[in-house]
Amino acid sequence: MKNVNPTHTLAWKALEDHFAVMKDTEMKTLFSQDPSRFNTFSRTFSDQILVDFSKNRITQETLDKLQALAKECDVAGAIKSMFSGEKINCTEDRAVLHTALRNRSNTPVMVDGKDVMPEVNAVLHKMKVFSERVISGEWKGYTGKAITDVVNIGIGGSDLGPYMVTEALRPYKNHLTMHFVSNVDGTHIAETLKKCDPETTLFLIASKTFTTQETMTNAHSARDWFLSAAKESAFVAKHFVALSTNSAEVEKFGIDTANMFEFWDWVGGRYSLWSAIGLSIVLSIGYDNFEQLLSGAHAMDNHFRTTEAENNIPMILALIGIWYNNFFGTETEAILPYDQYMHRFAAYFQQGNMESNGKYIDRDGNKVSYQTGPIIWGEPGTNGQHAFYQLIHQGTKLIPCDFIAPAISHNPLSDHHAKLMSNFFAQTEALAFGKTREQVDAEFASAGKDPATMGYVAPFKVFEGNRPTNSILLKEITPYSLGALIAMYEHKIFVQGVIFNIFTFDQWGVELGKQLANRILPELKGKESVNSHDSSTNNLINRYKAWR
């Protein structure tokens, strides 16, 4: 990968000049000038996903200049480097190959001269065999009963991805009840175990190192709870499996290493749902549906890897994001799925984006002089409309939004879905085109109210519009289309990281807090006052000790 400061490129300078022209351009003008604007600024993936980016403050010239930026930053070269197994995660000296986990073509993928695909396929086969035994009831607990509940214990990428996908694909789930425990707060594991029976519960301990503090604290509490009923430590092997690479620690815990599902250091946590970390997904929806999830992602990988920039959906979305982040000065992006099953999608990509591109040091080790990753947030529609859309419509912040919805609902009750979708379509129209003072006055007149006497209210009913959105319409949320959608966002994040000239696949920002917590933990014992920190931290710790 080439290290290029984007602000030193000719394309960046051209974009700054172009922004001076575009900053006050209104979308309603762009639409009136081009009746076929939708056709120009939309793309369809595999007859499954329509991406409409026409409601953005862009012209073809904008996209051309953004694509010139991608070319100067050698995004195409970076894509080749990632897919070919080069160690592009330089600070950890690792390849970045979550794409190999879903490589349905089985073409060789080389890391250090070795094809990783045989190992990938072996773990997938192991997941298939194990999941079929559990789902069928062949796998028995210590009293001979079949498993009814599965508890995934992990944190970060070992939790967010599997939880998001199992929720998004609930229409495909089987009889097993899934639970996810992540927080080291004892409430999380305690409340989960209240719903479970030790005779019929299977625990998945998801930790690459098997030393993650939060995960292992919860795992030991789960084991204690289990043994309080089962008594015999030998029974742990029937109720606990490991998603890990540390066989020594797994064995010490009491898990049979035959029930350890491996993954590799070239799989980043926030990109790991495609690996053994996805075992909870397989147990929830079955292996065939998991394969469809992989296939959808693989299809998007192929699109991303082989499609020219002007038709490359992740590339287009990434460049539009940079346009707002680095030229309009927006600080956040909202992800707004109009599908209740997708209620964890924004949280998943909050980690996916912010942990990947929340960096202020570039690939040369220098502090950047430009904005990098945006703040990501969002909630399902229509709930958000009655919560925070007020600020999106009439606030002083410009917030680009992704609206996501399926054309076909898994629950076609009465006219629920039509009402949901009418809101989906209405919101992007309202954000783009707004409502003028003239329209407000006309509404007063048609309601028999005198606009002159109602004038004091009128300013509050005006919507400026010109708020940018992408509309992402799926035919239906299936394992295949969800896989493609997730991969689309993953590659968008990657492209932005390349252009920002940062390392997208490490996460050193999580380390300092963990180190300090390990130092503070022993200080919380006993009653003696603590004075080894700053005055704020000392007094917070001492008040905690006094009150507990």
Curated annotation (Swiss-Prot):
Q: Which UniProt keywords apply?
A: Cytoplasm, Gluconeogenesis, Glycolysis, Isomerase
Active-site annotation: E355, H386, K514
Enzymatic reactions? alpha-D-glucose 6-phosphate = beta-D-fructose 6-phosphate
Q: Where in the cell is it found?
A: Cytoplasm
Question: Hey, which pathway is this one from?
Answer: Carbohydrate biosynthesis; gluconeogenesis; Carbohydrate degradation; glycolysis; D-glyceraldehyde 3-phosphate and glycerone phosphate from D-glucose: step 2/4
- Per the record's keyword annotation, is Repressor included, yes or no? no
Show the GO MF annotations: carbohydrate derivative binding; glucose-6-phosphate isomerase activity; monosaccharide binding
GO biological-process terms attached to the record = gluconeogenesis; glucose 6-phosphate metabolic process; glycolytic process
A cellular component annotation (GO) from this entry:
cytosol
Instruction: Give the family per the record.
Output: Belongs to the GPI family.
Q: What is this protein called?
A: Glucose-6-phosphate isomerase
Which organism is this entry from? Proteus mirabilis (strain HI4320)
